[in-house]
Amino acid sequence: MIRHFLADDDLTPSEQAAVLDEAARLKKDRYAARPLTGPRSVAVVFEKPSTRTRVSFEVAITELGGQPVVLDAVGSQLGRGEPIEDTARVLSRYVAAIVLRTFGHDRITTLARYATVPVVNALSDAYHPCQALADLLTIRERKGGLDGVRLAYVGDGNNVACSLLVAGAMAGLHVTVASPAGYQPPPAVVARAAEIGEQTGGRVEVVDDPRTAARNADVLYTDVWTSMGQEEETAARRRAFAGFTVDDDLLALAADDAIVLHCLPAHRGEEITASVLEGPQSAIFDQAENRLHTAKALLSFLLDAAGGRGIP
């Protein structure tokens, strides 16, 4: 059966846990899974610039035995207005899966509707589910588990925050998002995460005070205040997010053994200070590495579901 990964809850909680288990296994033995041996190809389509997402997926596909085929808007007909549904049907004839990083979430849902191979959301304006998998793996490594871990996200209630709410609830985390009024996660996403938490023991909360969120947190997480495509809002966002910087004072409110996460790229001196990013509690570069291992595990899972020799 063809499965897509467009939002975090396209996996069940048990499937999410299985993907994390496989990612941990592949981190220890990077060539233990070869579901793309042939090589089979995977299309990696970027309508939005990337460093970590692009490199992690290209390396993941290669280490799984496959061949990445990288497309961007400039070098393909997508940039000239070819309908995404046509692209979906054509690429499905060539490749084993399609990875898309885009702006509007409707782009990826349309792609999945017309594709006949698995589709992976490598980032949309609504969700960043691949990032959340890497975040959970990093937390599990550092904390020895996920159930009951207190995660405080401080900053823009963006795609990263939305995925942390949903994926965190699925894993049994207690997730608190601190964002100023007007920049909080969509109520529908918060409600969905709360609904999931009722089944898993996870809890979610949205507040407007970063100190409230950070107090006794096991994980302190932040992201940029201004995402790609929002550059005209930079000045207004800096004003709105004044007081939301993850600095030494905010970190001091968290648990003594708290870790700090950031999905990168970081703007030192804005959402996070250099001293925290480079400090002993930072797990940020382990987190970046885990994008690779979780990408491999996710692709293996989706290929297995499609009958393509994925997770053993």
Curated annotation (Swiss-Prot):
What role does this protein play?
Answer: Reversibly catalyzes the transfer of the carbamoyl group from carbamoyl phosphate (CP) to the N(epsilon) atom of ornithine (ORN) to produce L-citrulline.
EC identifiers of the protein: 2.1.3.3
Superkingdom classification of source: Bacteria
Q: What class of enzyme is it?
A: transferase
Q: Quick one: where is this thing mainly located?
A: cytoplasm
The answer to keyword Isomerase applying to this record is no
Show the HAMAP family listed in the entry. OTCase
Fetch the PANTHER family from UniProt: ORNITHINE CARBAMOYLTRANSFERASE, MITOCHONDRIAL, ORNITHINE TRANSCARBAMYLASE, MITOCHONDRIAL
Q: In which pathway does it act?
A: Amino-acid biosynthesis; L-arginine biosynthesis; L-arginine from L-ornithine and carbamoyl phosphate: step 1/3
Keyword Transport belongs to the record: no
- Please identify the protein, giving its name as recorded: Ornithine carbamoyltransferase
Provide this UniProt record's keywords sorted from A to Z.
Answer: Amino-acid biosynthesis, Arginine biosynthesis, Cytoplasm, Transferase
Query: Quick one: a GO cellular component term?
Result: cytoplasm
List the gene name.
argF
**Any idea where this protein resides?**
Cytoplasm
- Please give the family membership noted in the entry: Belongs to the aspartate/ornithine carbamoyltransferase superfamily. OTCase family.
